[in-house]
């Protein structure tokens, strides 16, 4: 039992970094995903093609590969990022693509008559989206968004690949140092608690 109290501070420090990555990604990826979803409603083919290519790449390649690309490959063309910003950018770009598809699906379920009614009532396009479309879309997509949020909690463990001191790195360090699997089990329990919250 004393061993648990010995390793707990480093694991909680790692969990703090995990939560920081999670919060930053969530704060930036959901609004970006919503913007992308509404941009897909604009009837301009070049924009549609660019967004669809972006979504195809982000959803079709592993997040780990995207992390490695942003942190290790971009410096070869002169773009250097520290570990944490590189991880945040990779996660935001990846999750924004998923959120964009979720919100696009929600937007597509709204009947066209609602847009026409808003036009008759002289709502501006912004007011139509803000007061009529977005509240309904939010209600529709909430279960899917929560599923992605739970995936994000688990995916934050990938920042370990960049050497960021998250929960996984802290537990692995303790496990290697002490030749014990207890830190890994404790990390798993912390992830379960985070997902349960």
Spans of features found by a protein language model:
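Transmembrane alpha-helices and adjacent helix-loop boundaries
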Residues: 1-197
């Amino acid at each position: 039992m004393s061993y648990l109290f010995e390793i707990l501070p480093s694991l909680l420090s790692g969990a703090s970094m995990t939560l920081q990555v999670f919060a930053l990604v969530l704060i930036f990826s959901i609004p970006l995903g919503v913007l992308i979803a509404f941009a897909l409603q604009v009837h301009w083919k070049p924009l549609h093609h660019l967004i669809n290519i972006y979504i195809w790449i982000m959803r079709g390649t592993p997040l780990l590969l995207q992390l490695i690309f942003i942190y290790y490959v971009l410096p070869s063309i002169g773009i250097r990022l520290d570990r944490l910003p590189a991880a945040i950018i990779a996660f935001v770009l990846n999750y924004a693509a998923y959120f964009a598809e979720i919100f696009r699906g929600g937007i597509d379920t709204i009947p066209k008559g609602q847009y026409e009614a808003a036009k008759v009532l002289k709502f501006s396009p912004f007011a139509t989206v803000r007061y009529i479309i977005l509240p309904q879309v939010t209600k529709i997509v909430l279960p899917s968004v929560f599923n992605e949020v739970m995936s994000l909690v688990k995916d934050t463990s990938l920042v370990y690949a960049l050497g960021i001191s998250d929960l996984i790195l802290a537990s692995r360090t303790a496990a290697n140092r002490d030749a014990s699997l207890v830190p890994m089990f404790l990390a798993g329990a912390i992830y379960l608690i985070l997902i349960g919250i």
